[in-house]
A protein has these predicted regions:
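Short, Lys/Arg-rich, polar N-terminal cytosolic tail immediately upstream
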Residues: 1-8, 144-146
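Membrane-helix boundary elements
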Residues: 11-58
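Core segments of alpha-helical transmembrane spans in multipass integral membrane proteins
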Residues: 23-24, 47-79, 93-97
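Juxtamembrane helix-break-helix junctions at the cytosolic face
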Residues: 72-87, 107
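Non-cytosolic membrane-interface motifs at loop->transmembrane helix junctions
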Residues: 87, 91, 111-122
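Hydrophobic alpha-helical membrane segments
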Residues: 88-103
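Membrane-helix boundary connector in multi-pass membrane proteins
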Residues: 101-118, 135-136
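Membrane-water interface at the C-terminal end of transmembrane alpha helices
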Residues: 124-147
């Protein structure tokens, strides 16, 4: 995929990611226990009976919400000119890789909590998606607008 088709695909992907990050961020801050319980229920349905621990540490909730706001913002800025803001996709991939690997470490070292495994898989996939979009943005075939 090259040219205008690649650009349209990258823009669409970034817009969808921005919306999903915003929705998840709002859910994190509005109903953190509900998110954990729902995902734990799915884990139990799949055979993992270790429930996600609840937290009363509001600082971590605030930081998780802030992270979701930042990555949604990265997607919104990058989609405005995917050639010019292409490097932001590497920042997004780095953040998602850190989240994915951190979750894997908690899953392996702490407890086999389903949400840790799920976050490893989801954020790992999102990191790969960000790298793929970065690659596609490099195939658009026009110079970056100096702005």
């Amino acid at each position: 995929m090259r040219g205008a088709k690649a650009e349209a695909f990258v823009v669409l992907g970034l817009r969808l990611m921005a919306v999903s990050f915003a929705v998840v961020g709002i859910l994190f801050i509005a109903v953190p226990s509900g998110v954990l319980d729902t995902i734990s229920d799915v884990g139990e349905w799949l055979g993992n009976d270790t429930r996600a621990p609840h937290t009363q540490e509001d600082l971590w909730l605030a930081l998780a919400f802030a992270y979701m706001v930042v990555i949604a913002g990265i997607c919104l800025v990058a989609q405005m000119d995917v050639v010019r803001y292409r490097p932001l996709l590497l920042v997004l991939a780095a953040g998602k890789t850190a989240s994915s690997l951190g979750s894997l470490a908690f899953f392996l070292i702490d407890e086999h909590v389903f949400i840790y495994l799920l976050n490893f898989l989801v954020d790992g996939t999102l990191a790969l998606l960000a790298l793929w979009l970065w690659s596609l943005a490099g195939r658009i075939g026009r110079p970056a607008d100096p702005g």
